[in-house]
């Protein structure tokens, strides 16, 4: 009789060993899971300084002396999908804290949670409405003609559109994992989206459900995102630090607002189906989005292993804009790792801060002054007012 290649006693021994480890983990689990856990996210102090409908503007409090803070503030625009809290997961793993420590005066858009009344809001409403109002608010608060702008994922696409339509208001533009070229077969998402019947989906749901989009993202890599991840959790269930980090990430992943229906419809049709943006053919608010009008400095980050927004979707942008000061940075990480991995934490935030500081020193812009003509009009108005008051006294 032939001997088995793997003796049964070896298999049984391995099973017994694994069972012993599982039992040890299970014995520790109640102490960890039922004990005090620090799973709070987005704990960095901020003030809500502007509100419009569901949209809020966060202004983070400085952590260094005011005189050391960069004069030109940075506005960060996150995607409509998921929440901006991912940039502030925990101390030591927070893009927000890193930027503050490096002297950035930081603002962040909180898109909130769309309701049924928001289903007809378009890209124009978000870019030329909410974003433009927020940019004007910050410019007025700081008495500056231009501010710095940074976009993340779909929020980065919005920032590219905004900078092309309102270049006079943006000093420096930073894009991170930002899709602009949708004519690529890299990544399953781009292949899927080309055949999505977006009209049927939006007509049926109104707003695009966040839970449905989350399921779609999980199905892009089900083995890793739906099996391996939870196997890893079970194997580390007795490790308090691991459990806390795991829960923080799960909180962010499954905090998924719906996306306004008309915005989703236009984004899928104009970008995924027709690839209009990178060709400077996309129309927003009745105006063509001409990328050549992006003449301000541009810093473009993307991840080498990003399965949602692959390098091919990001790296073309710098060759299509009108700016002569552009830089591409490809990090050895994925879509989320660029913001939360320990290695990228040491490079991502400091690189952005350093880049902005260099350009702040190169070209210092004067503060906004009221136009002389407007002053003259004001004086005439005052004169008329005084004259009319004298007549009334008589």
Residue ranges of predicted features:
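Alpha/beta-hydrolase-fold enzymes
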Residues: 1-18, 140, 144, 159-262
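Short, surface-exposed "cap/lid" segments of acyl-processing enzymes
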Residues: 35, 42-115
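Alpha/beta-hydrolase active-site loop
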Residues: 120-141
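Alpha/beta-hydrolase fold nucleophile elbow
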Residues: 131-132, 141-154
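Short beta-strand/loop motif that positions the catalytic acidic residue
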Residues: 294, 300-302, 306
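Conserved alpha/beta-hydrolase "acid-adjacent" motif
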Residues: 307-313
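Catalytic histidine-centered segment of alpha/beta-hydrolase-like enzymes
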Residues: 308, 328, 332-347
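Catalytic histidine neighborhood in serine/cysteine hydrolases
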Residues: 314, 319-336
């Amino acid at each position: 009789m032939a001997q088995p290649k793997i003796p049964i006693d070896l298999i049984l021994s391995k099973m017994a060993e694994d069972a012993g480890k599982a039992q040890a983990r299970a014995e520790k689990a109640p102490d960890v899971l039922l004990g005090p856990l620090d799973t709070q996210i987005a704990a960095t102090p901020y003030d809500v300084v502007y509100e419009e409908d569901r949209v809020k503007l966060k202004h983070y409090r400085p952590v260094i002396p005011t005189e050391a803070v960069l004069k030109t503030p940075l506005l960060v625009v996150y995607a409509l999908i998921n929440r901006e809290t991912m940039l502030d997961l925990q101390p030591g793993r927070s893009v927000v804290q890193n930027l503050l420590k490096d002297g950035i005066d930081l603002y962040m858009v909180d898109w909130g949670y769309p309701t049924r009344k928001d289903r007809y809001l378009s890209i124009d409403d978000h870019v030329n409405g909410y974003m433009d109002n927020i940019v004007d608010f910050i410019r007025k608060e700081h008495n500056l003609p231009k501010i710095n702008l940074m976009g993340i994922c779909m929020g980065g696409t919005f920032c590219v559109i905004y900078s092309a339509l309102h270049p006079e208001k943006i000093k420096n533009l930073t894009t991170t994992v930002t899709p602009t070229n949708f004519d690529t077969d890299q990544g399953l998402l781009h292949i899927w989206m080309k055949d999505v019947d977006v009209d049927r989906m939006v007509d049926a749901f109104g707003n695009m459900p966040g839970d449905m989009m989350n399921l779609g993202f999980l199905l892009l890599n089900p083995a890793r995102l739906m099996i391996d991840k939870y196997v890893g959790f079970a194997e580390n269930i007795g490790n308090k630090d691991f459990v806390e980090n795991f829960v923080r990430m799960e909180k962010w992943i499954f905090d998924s607002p719906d996306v306004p229906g008309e915005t989703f419809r236009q984004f899928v049709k104009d970008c995924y189906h027709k690839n209009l943006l990178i060709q400077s053919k996309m129309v927003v608010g009745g105006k063509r989005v001409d990328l050549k009008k992006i003449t301000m400095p541009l810093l473009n980050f993307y991840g080498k292993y990003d399965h949602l927004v692959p390098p091919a979707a990001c790296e073309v942008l710098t060759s299509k804009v009108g700016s002569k000061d552009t830089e591409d940075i490809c990090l050895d990480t994925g879509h989320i790792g660029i913001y939360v991995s320990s290695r990228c934490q040491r490079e991502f935030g400091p690189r952005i801060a350093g880049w902005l500081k260099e350009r702040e020193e190169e070209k210092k812009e004067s503060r906004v002054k009221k136009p002389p003509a407007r002053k003259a009009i004001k004086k005439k108005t005052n004169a008329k007012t005084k004259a009319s008051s004298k007549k009334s006294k008589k």
